[in-house]
Amino acid sequence: MSLEVRRTAEREIQRYHAKTGLSITALLKYAGIPHRTWREWARRRGAETKHNNNIPKSYHLTPEEVKAIIAYCVNNSLKGYRMQCWEMVDRNVAFVSCSSVYNVIKHHNLDKKWVEVKEAAKQGFEQPTAVHEQWHIDFSYIKIQNSFYYFIGILDGYSRKLLNWRLCKNMEGINAEILVAETKEMYPQAAGPRLISDNGSQFISKNFEELLALLEFSHTFTSANHPQSNGKLERFHRTLKTEHVRRSSYLEYQDACIRLAEWIAYYNSERLHSAIWYLTPNDVFYGRTAVRLAERKEKLHTAYIKRQEYWRTRNAVS
């Protein structure tokens, strides 16, 4: 309300008070003006009304933070805003919440629509509570030039770390047996993990079952025609093909092995995973979860304090 309008309202209230003898309180109630507003008008009588709508609050992002977020999101537009957020925190680009990142990219039309994935009715197996409790194994096709090869990997169900893998020229059972034996040698501390596989001929063979018995593994088969039962590894295969295979053009088999190894190293040690608090599989696998989350919390708190000081200084000057 402008000063002129406020003065007019005050004069009218005083005029009716003098003319009718009604109390100021009654006239204010009739006019719909709260008594606290009248007292505030009296306190600021003669002073122009100042609105603070345009004064940035202490929790607002600074211009430098907004610029950093925009620049990072433009260069990483294929990733979701939550992954972008925690990558920026981990890489010391900007220390803001996921909702703040979303608001910035939404305001600057940098967001993209995602297909909503409906949750399956079945929730699958009981989830592991530590590493090496559940291992997942499966094959997937990869095309190199004009030939198909077969990627087989073992994924730790708790950390989502790909423990071991091979790129095979066929789907014979010996490839699965070698991979399981190699992985057990790599991680001797794994005491009888539960191996989850589909009902492929490689996994139901007598030789494969004898190997698992020798290694003291338990074996669980997924439901027929229900790949979601092995969903963690199926999701890894999807990520592998979406983020790497379909963007690459392998020259030949050896070239594919080298580049797959590089991407898998990136997946395990750098790529943030939405199912494990947007940490890397190695963070969870090696027990760094609490430390990494605490580091992020400290960064966000420090940035919040600096942001408050920034706006306090700016608002004091203006």
Task: Please annotate each region the language model reported.
Residues 192-199, 213-232, 248-253:
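RNase H-like polynucleotidyl transferase catalytic core
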Residues 189-205, 225, 277-282:
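Acidic/histidine-rich, metal-coordinating catalytic segments
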Residues 36-37, 207-210, 214, 231, ...:
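Generic alpha-helical secondary structure signal
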Residues 39-134, 286-291:
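Basic, flexible linker segments flanking DNA-binding modules
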